[in-house]
Amino acid sequence: MVNKMSREIILHAGLHKTGTTSIQQTLYDDFNNRILEKLDILYPKNWPANHSYPVYSAFCDKPEEYRGNILFSSGLSKEKIDEMNKTNLKNLEEEVQRRRCSKIVISGEDISFLKKKNLNIKLPQQILHIRTFV
């Protein structure tokens, strides 16, 4: 069953060396994350605190050339990386459905390297609106 609830994504494409890691760790912290959820804000917990890896890998033009995949998934074929990306997005979609917050915060430094065209595709159906803050 697809939830038709409209959700807003707040995309924090923090640049490298600007304190983004501190923001991510604060939002990811269990205590703070529960407070955010009570405020109807989801900071996904099924991904690492820094969302760079799952987001950039899923949305870039050539995930097999992404440094994160080269460092952390060395030896995986393009097909396996694509499968991993689909799993990461499915896990996000399931968490969004389960936690039912109307706002979703995604934060990752590598997101700032994505082209705008890459962010306009592959989004789960129930996510309808994106606001980007840099």
List where the protein language model places each region.
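PAPS-dependent sulfotransferase catalytic domain
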Residues: 32, 36-37, 103, 111-112, ...
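PAPS-dependent sulfotransferase catalytic core
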Residues: 1-90, 95-104, 108-109
